[in-house]
Amino acid sequence: IAKYDDLKQGKSDVNPFVILKCPWCGAQMGVVSRKKGTKEVPGYEKIMGPKRQKKIVFRCRNIANDCAFSKKDYVLPLYVIDESIYDVKPTLLLGTVDKFAMLPFRPEAQGLFGYSNGTKITAPDLIIQDELHLISGPLGSMVGHYETMINELCTLSVHDKQIYPKIIASTATISRAKEQCHALYGCPKEKVFQFPPSGLSAG
């Protein structure tokens, strides 16, 4: 809330709320400079939450009012603050490795993996990893520890059968893909499928 107020009052140029356009219609959101140093932040609203706590929500400010999320009773289902993410448990979650490192220190994060009030519900079943080629060497060794933890938290046990999450990774290079995935995720090499497959060797 304090960072939102700082944005509106022109006290800060740093926008921690990330969202710059409505993902539905493309209308501008975020900081817009005005006269006398003040700033408008269309699309960001400060409201009172159900627990009488102020929170920031995202509502499209489409001038034509033809966006589904510009209506008074609708807000965009986007959450960029950690506390909101832990509370809402969104269907799609974007994160970086440094957030993995915080998991042992945030007990409330267990809800993201299906643990709620001591019971286990369905955990995330699809992990998409971007820039796989960057996770190698010393960084890969460190990330591998957290990936093992994430895989375990996302594994579902049904009738003594382990159902592991599917992992899709994109990379700029496909050399030694099976070896890297085996080292990073602990998956058997025969379970790694490369697309597109290797072509013909020439020369």
Report each predicted region and the residues it spans.
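Structural recognition of the conserved hydrophobic beta-strand(s) that form the central parallel beta-sheet
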Residues: 92-95, 128, 165-171
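Short beta-alpha connecting loops at secondary-structure transitions
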Residues: 132, 162-165
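A substrate-engagement module of RecA-like helicase motors
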Residues: 1-92, 97-101, 108-118, 122
